[in-house]
Amino acid sequence: MTNIRKTHPLLKIVNHSLIDLPAPSNISAWWNFGSLLGLCLMIQILTGLFLAMHYTSDTATAFSSVTHICRDVNYGWLIRYLHANGASMFFICLYMHVGRGIYYGSYTYLETWNIGIILLFAVMATAFMGYVLPWGQMSFWGATVITNFLSAIPYIGTTLVEWIWGGFSVDKATLTRFFAFHFILPFIIAALVMIHLLFLHETGSNNPSGIPSDSDKIPFHPYYTIKDVLGFLILILLLTLLVLFSPDLLGDPDNYTPANPLNTPPHIKPEWYFLFAYAILRSIPNKLGGVLALVMSILILAIIPLLHMSKQRSMMFRPISQVLFWILVADLLTLTWIGGQPVEHPFITIGQVASILYFSIILIFMPLASLIENKILKW
């Protein structure tokens, strides 16, 4: 008799996705981040669900309800910090996953890559709205500053901002709708993940060499299931260490002060995972220009496949591109640092140089390096 996992309509899908899936024999630990992102999403949905049971999305009680969760709910503090730091883990995995895609040329799977970009935007939107919910000082002012950027859109800007706010400032209506969106988006993200995987399984996984691996495939289970489980254990260990030893390491102390529209914090800044984009935004003195640069800093991922000039897919055998890639990583770390600094000399200049370098590497230097490497191949 044929195994039920190969005949049952539902189990058949699981089987083709996770068990009998032919996978390249040489994919490294950089291919673990996809499954780790799935784990992060599950952790976030579960902890978020339990937080939503005790949270109230009203300006008068939001801050108190979060305090209540941490003080009075059984293990509420644990759930709250798992959720807050789980977001940080989510973004670490996201950036590693995208970096892997750029390094090994995975972006040539266009559908998978583009759904991935939509996913990145969706996760960023969810994280931003989630940061507003505790209704602390940084929640309120972060929401005010970021939503205000939409007013830079010509003609409809101001109307658009007031429409999003549901009034003339960030208030009760804004908080309520942000909670509604923050709740629904992760499920939309989960659906997009399914589409992401659907497109990936049309082509099969890439591998570090960038060379087609059809002639050398191994079953996903047990080889990569056990490898993924090791990744899960490492991620859970790191998250647990963070939550139990320094849960506020990545947070902002200002968010322990209830939101006050009459008192602006000295330094308004987002969570660490948005600082690189925030630095790019601030490095342009013009409002509309800054907003465009902010959007382009992520949207630039969509044109990376068009800029692929190399005859090789992966950077594994392309030393010049490798050097540029790691300069890009260092540049992003520099931008992250600058985003958290006050707007004063020398940080302004460093931020502007780093921003120009970010776009230059992707748009100019990497394609040029690829062309040079193509020439070197002929020597």
Swiss-Prot record:
PANTHER family per UniProt: CYTOCHROME B
Query: At which positions is heme b b566 bound?
Result: H97, H196
- What gene, per UniProt, encodes this protein? MT-CYB
Q: Which InterPro entries match?
A: Cyt_b/b6_C (IPR005798), Cyt_b/b6_C_sf (IPR036150), Cyt_b/b6_N (IPR005797), Cytb/b6-like_sf (IPR027387), Cytochrome_b (IPR030689), Cytochrome_b_C_euk/bac (IPR048260), Cytochrome_b_N_euk/bac (IPR048259), Di-haem_cyt_TM (IPR016174)
What this protein needs as a cofactor is: heme b
Q: Which residues bind a ubiquinone?
A: H201
Q: What interactions and quaternary structure are annotated?
A: The cytochrome bc1 complex contains 11 subunits: 3 respiratory subunits (MT-CYB, CYC1 and UQCRFS1), 2 core proteins (UQCRC1 and UQCRC2) and 6 low-molecular weight proteins (UQCRH/QCR6, UQCRB/QCR7, UQCRQ/QCR8, UQCR10/QCR9, UQCR11/QCR10 and a cleavage product of UQCRFS1). This cytochrome bc1 complex then forms a dimer.
An example Gene Ontology cellular component term from the record?
Answer: mitochondrial inner membrane
Q: Which GO terms describe its molecular function?
A: metal ion binding; ubiquinol-cytochrome-c reductase activity
Q: Which GO BP terms apply?
A: mitochondrial electron transport, ubiquinol to cytochrome c
Keywords in alphabetical order: Electron transport, Heme, Iron, Membrane, Metal-binding, Mitochondrion, Mitochondrion inner membrane, Respiratory chain, Transmembrane, Transmembrane helix, Transport, Ubiquinone
Similarity-based family:
Belongs to the cytochrome b family.
Record-listed heme b b562 binding positions: H83, H182
**Name of this protein:** Cytochrome b
- Give yes or no: UniProt keyword Glycosyltransferase: no
The protein's location, in the record's own words, is: Mitochondrion inner membrane
Q: Name one Pfam family in it.
A: Cytochrom_B_C
The function of this protein is: Component of the ubiquinol-cytochrome c reductase complex (complex III or cytochrome b-c1 complex) that is part of the mitochondrial respiratory chain. The b-c1 complex mediates electron transfer from ubiquinol to cytochrome c. Contributes to the generation of a proton gradient across the mitochondrial membrane that is then used for ATP synthesis.
Q: What other facts are recorded?
A: Heme 1 (or BL or b562) is low-potential and absorbs at about 562 nm, and heme 2 (or BH or b566) is high-potential and absorbs at about 566 nm.
Q: How does the entry describe its membrane topology?
A: Multi-pass membrane protein
How the cofactor binds, per note? Binds 2 heme b groups non-covalently.
Transmembrane annotation, as ranges: 33-53, 77-98, 113-133, 178-198, 226-246, 288-308, 320-340, 347-367
